Regions:
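Helical mechanochemical/support elements of P-loop NTPase systems and associated helical scaffolds
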Residues: 2, 6, 10, 21, ...
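Conserved pre-motif I regulatory segment
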Residues: 1-42
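Post-DEXD/H (motif II) to motif III coupling segment of the RecA-like Helicase ATP-binding lobe
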Residues: 140-228
Length: 231
């Protein structure tokens, strides 16, 4: 795959997995993502968003670090956790990155103990990650990348406040949102979480505009925040 200044070990793994040519989305986003800027990337299902996530994490982290995670990836469900782990296994073949996934059906104590031994990339579902970050107090000072994949279905399940709770515990890091559509909920979350993001829209369908008045999505967000504060 021909991308500017791509890691040689990553390049080799991409070629071995048949990824010899970068598609439009990979070409147009690679340099911006590599720069560390916040981004919103909109693209349809099957366009290679998961591959972009993995190759950019590998590109930035390069190899094994210290004990604390340096990339945090939020995905929709257990199936997505396993899928992302599999892509890391393939494309990270020539790196020593330590990747670990958590989901709602996993054992909390086992997950906490495993993470405490040292990992580089943590993948998980919103509920599980929120619960873990609330109770375990992980060191997030070395976190370089905070990535939200599957943003549209995740926000439809009203996980905004859990995501913000995790994001607010992190000081300076690159924040990236991936989704199939740029919905109102995503725009509201991005306004709260991202700093002057670059927006890449590869969705063929044109998005409708949003009203300036407070929307139903905003009201839902505020209600969710109030509910979680009472927990």
């Amino acid at each position: 795959m021909k991308l500017k200044k791509i890691n040689e070990n990553l390049q080799q793994a991409l070629i071995e997995n048949g990824l010899t040519e970068a598609n439009e989305m990979q070409q147009e986003t690679f340099s911006t993502l590599k720069s560390g800027a916040d981004c919103i990337i909109i693209a349809p299902n099957g366009s290679g968003k998961s591959t972009i996530i993995v190759l950019n994490v590998i590109q930035q982290l390069k190899g094994e670090g210290e004990e604390s995670p340096r990339a945090l990836i939020i995905v929709e469900d257990k199936a997505k956790v396993l899928e992302m782990e599999e892509i890391f296994e393939k494309l990270g073949k020539y790196t020593d990155l330590r990747v670990y996934g958590v989901h709602d059906k996993g054992d909390m104590e086992y997950d906490k103990n495993y993470i405490s031994t040292g990992i580089d990339v943590l993948i998980g579902t919103p509920f599980k990650l929120s619960e873990m970050f609330t109770t375990a107090g992980y060191n997030v000072n070395r976190l370089k990348m905070f990535i939200l994949d599957d943003a549209d279905p995740i926000l439809k399940l009203r996980h905004e406040t859990r995501i913000m709770r995790i994001s607010n515990s992190i000081n300076k890091t690159q924040r990236i949102i991936f989704s199939e559509q740029l919905t109102e909920r995503i725009e509201i979350l991005a306004d709260k979480m991202l700093l002057e993001p670059f927006v890449f829209d590869f969705d063929e369908e044109e998005e409708e505009g949003f009203d300036e008045e407070e929307s139903e999505a905003e009201k839902d967000f505020e209600e969710d925040e109030e509910g979680l504060e009472e927990e």
